[in-house]
């Protein structure tokens, strides 16, 4: 009996040094809290400026015809663009995932590829081809070509993992194929379409270069013009406040439309593999028109336009003295930003996965709310704050990197969460019970398993910074020129030939992002 007690005591002591759910370290918690409070800086700035300005001034600046015009433009842009993107994205997802469309795997990759072309490069391609493209119609057309993959990707992922048995049951009960699609399949695409639509809508509100190039006024272009022309703080800040309200309204609307509905397969057995719906030759030829048309418009026109300008410019365009320094500046800023943001995201991701308490979920949510705000709002907040309170860092790389941190933290956070979730705490505990130190256990289990998620998050941040235009224009130090700002300066001078190499390099840098997003969507579907 005593031997058994002694053995039990030794076992208890051995495992007591490896608690299953230890408390998070103070440094981790404090870091997460400080970063989350920092993330609320732009939102707090807008609210603070509104209170400081006073109701009478706010009313005079907000309730005027110009703001009504901008609001109408924004609403029309969103209301017209989203349904078209939804129809095209879902239709293309259905054709590539659930039918025998010829070359459907190739079309699936090409449907993602427009994300490699920055929206302002897409606009540059079309405006240089059709100089008369201006206004709302042009804005909707180019926005659809630039952003429809944001609905295609999640819709395709859902269709890949959807159990076809559900559709078979509906068919056996007498429903015809169109009724099966609208009553069975489409409701299960609701979450994907709502999420993709929200992402597109936020891009529409935040985009500057696309709409400035086609001379279509939105809140972002108006704020930038106000800031550049008169440095009128109150007017620009009030426009930013209205823009923030629009973004928060979109978040609320998406949450309401999404509802609490969730879809899951229940019952015994596993979902059977899908059998693509066979298309007859005439129907297949007709169905091919959609991916061919979208590929030609979203990819063919930009690449043909770039090839044309590069051909006209010859080798001289590559000898531009500012091109290669701009590439180096872009790579260095992107690398520094990716490293900084990934390191800053680790504490929050760690707490979110290992200690999913309500407080930590709220802290994590602060970062997502801020990332929904347009870059122009973040930049305007940092410009005003640094001028008034931290003048030494105004228009320095510190402020620029801080803006990137506020804007792109969720891109690293989401991937870090997924990576850390691949390394359950039990594996770390087992390693420590086998004699490894906490640091060795962390390195040999958690960090190794989380490495792909860390790398994916850093890559997404790197590529986002490489193509960022609006905040960089406002915050970059004097003399700093990235590929995006260099491209913008040349297109503003109507020097489309000299701008072509900048655009081509940005597209080349974005191609890995396209492949990464496509691969992630396949992994999400379990393929």
UniProtKB/Swiss-Prot annotation:
Keywords: Cell inner membrane, Cell membrane, Ion transport, Iron, Iron transport, Membrane, Repeat, Transmembrane, Transmembrane helix, Transport. Type- repeats lie at residues 10-15, 66-70, 167-177, 274-280, 319-323, 428-438. It is a multi-pass membrane protein. The keyword rRNA-binding does not apply. Pfam families: BPD_transp_1. It comes from the Bacteria. One of its GO terms (cellular component) is plasma membrane. It is found in: Cell inner membrane. SUPFAM superfamilies: MetI-like. GO terms for biological process: iron ion transport; transmembrane transport. The complex is composed of two ATP-binding proteins (FbpC), two transmembrane proteins (FbpB) and a solute-binding protein (FbpA). Part of the ABC transporter complex FbpABC (TC 3.A.1.10.1) involved in Fe(3+) ions import. Probably responsible for the translocation of the substrate across the membrane. Belongs to the binding-protein-dependent transport system permease family. FbpB subfamily. This is Fe(3+)-transport system permease protein SfuB. The gene is fbpB.
